[in-house]
Structure formats: C-alpha cells, structure tokens
C-alpha cells in the first residue's frame, strides 16, 4: 500500500504482503455453480490480505478491496488513510450460497485476523485498519453466532471485533485490486514483515 510505512518496507525489500461450521447445506468445492449470488463485507485491516484470503475459497466468485463504514461518498485511498472519513478498509465478497454459506465465510474470517487488537491489524495500525463484520439484517444471526463461537475460543473479554450493520461499500482504486496475486513478491515481503502468520498462530494456535 502507499502508506509511508509500507512504502518504506517495499523499498527496503527491493520492491519485492472459527469455530466449526454450524450450517448444513449442499456446499463444497465439488458443488456446481448454482448461478445464485450473495454478498458479504468484511474489514480485517489491510484489504490486500483480506481479499487474498477469500478469493481462494471454493464458492467465492469475487473479492473486491474497498472501504465501508464512513460518511464520505466514493472516498479515495489517500482520503481514508489521512482520516476524517470514518471509513475503514474492507472487502466485498461475492459468493455462491449453494457452494459456501455465509456462516462459513464468517467462521473463516475470524481465523485470518487478530480480533483482540482494537487499533488495527499486525503492522497496520490506525483507525482505517479497524476490524468488523458488516452484516445485513438477514446475515446478522449467523454473524453473531459465529462471533460468539470464535470469542469462546480465545476469551470473550479479549474479543473486540464487532458485528456492524451493513452499509454501502465503495471499491478502492484499480491498483489495489488483486494486489497479492499480481504482486506476489511485494505482497509476500509485506506479509512477512508484518508477522501475520506468527501472530495468527499465537491467537488461534496451530
């Protein structure tokens, strides 16, 4: 990302980044595409990482990096990073509910973040890197149930990531989309520097 810290990291690296499913449904990698589409929105710090985590899941049709939760329409990345917009980095996940359920997506999301950090994620700290699940009224029961199950694993008092009401999602600039896939060396260097894997093991175990 173009934030000063990450820019420095990239240059320094020679420009090199829970609970068991509770729903029973005909889901899985072997299921055929039903043509149905639903949308989920997750904020887990750096949207490069969140997007990459979801786009490899069977049943996920698309993952788009962007912003949610704020007051400014069609914000730019620089506006969000500077602050004052109320937005946080988020990813909109489009999925086939016949292949993967919303609950399964939320369960997976917890395992890719540190939900005990109120100030950001890993080396990305600040208001724009806060975590959240943005859920519609229909999605909220599954999201809340998943949150309770995940919190029980690590201690409810430590678990700070909220389930928030669904709001409008704004896509980020084109150069942020598919960043991990298109820039594997740069993203890999960023991810290692941030210590994502080690921290996730510390929070969730092996």
Spans of features found by a protein language model:
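Flexible coil/turn and secondary-structure edge motifs
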Residues: 2, 13-206
């Amino acid at each position: 990302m173009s934030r000063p810290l990450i820019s420095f990291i990239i240059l320094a690296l020679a420009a090199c980044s829970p609970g068991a499913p509770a729903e029973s449904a005909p889901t899985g990698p072997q299921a055929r595409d039903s043509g149905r589409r639903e949308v989920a929105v997750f904020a887990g710090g750096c949207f490069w990482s969140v997007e990459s985590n979801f786009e490899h899941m069977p049943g996920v049709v698309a993952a788009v990096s962007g912003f949610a939760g704020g007051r400014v329409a069609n914000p730019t990345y620089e506006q969000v990073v500077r602050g004052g917009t109320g937005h946080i980095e988020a990813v909109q996940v489009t999925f086939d509910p016949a292949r993967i359920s919303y609950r399964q997506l939320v369960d997976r999301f917890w395992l890719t973040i540190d939900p005990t950090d109120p100030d950001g994620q890993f080396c990305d700290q600040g208001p724009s890197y806060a975590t959240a699940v943005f859920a519609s009224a229909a999605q909220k029961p599954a999201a809340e149930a998943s949150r309770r199950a995940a919190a029980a694993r690590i201690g409810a008092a430590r678990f700070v990531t909220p389930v928030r009401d669904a709001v409008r999602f704004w896509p980020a600039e084109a150069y942020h989309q598919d960043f991990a896939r298109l820039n594997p060396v740069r993203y890999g260097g960023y991810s290692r520097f941030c210590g994502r894997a080690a921290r996730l093991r510390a929070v969730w175990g092996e």
